[in-house]
Amino acid sequence: AAVSSSQKDDSEAEDSSIDIGGGKYGIHIRHLIQLMAFYGIITYIVVVVIFNLPFLMEKHHFSSGNSGLMISLFFLAITAPGFCLNKIVGLLKERTKAYSLLSIALGLLLIWIAPLEWLIIPGCLLVGLGYGVIQPMLYEKTTHAALPQKATMALAFVMMMNYLAILLYPFIGDFLQWVFHTQSQEFPFIFNLLITVGTFFWAYRCRDTFLFNDQLK
């Protein structure tokens, strides 16, 4: 009985430490929307590597095997930060997402500026590393926007944005190329680079807010 009472007290203390903004659903709606929007944006930014890099490399007369290798390195880089995420966040703290976006921006720039493997390889790695840091941070942050019994629902909404961004990317890309009257294979990288730079300034300016202030223990 004493153990049960102690567990109940711990659970109540955990619930009281989570800010749900007075939401009646046990979820801080504004924070959840911010997380969803940010995750959708960064996923849209990085999937340019999957969708458009093969066409860009084909234009520069690389083989399909070369583009496949680059995409494999991109996914490998996404997984790498998970092995030392706490150290990364402990070092960068509220600037974690801003510097991760800077990594993505630099990666896109390297892919865009020259058709050389020795630039495209680090470009793919930098994009993957930046995304690999941000993704688990968003999942962790989501648990602080909902009560424990609502955390799974909140995570489902956030994770939905990943698939939604992938689903909509080809349609948005085609629409933007139609709007700007271009069929350039570099255009998606330039456009996503601009989005990344804008998002970087947003993250840096708002580094002390709920969405961007990351301090894992």
Annotate each PLM feature.
Residues 31-72, 78:
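Extracytoplasmic gate region of multi-pass secondary transporters
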Residues 133-146:
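Intracellular juxtamembrane helix-capping segments at the cytosolic ends
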Residues 80-94, 177-178:
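Helix-to-loop junctions at the C-terminal end of transmembrane segments
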Residues 95-110:
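Structural signature of the two symmetry-related core transmembrane helices
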Residues 145-181:
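A late C-terminal transmembrane helix in Major Facilitator Superfamily
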Residues 4-38, 217:
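Juxtamembrane intracellular "pre-TM" segments in multi-pass secondary transporters
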Residues 1-13, 199-207:
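C-terminal membrane-cytosol helix-exit motif in multi-pass small-molecule transporters
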Residues 173-195:
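A membrane-interface helix-boundary motif in multi-pass transporters
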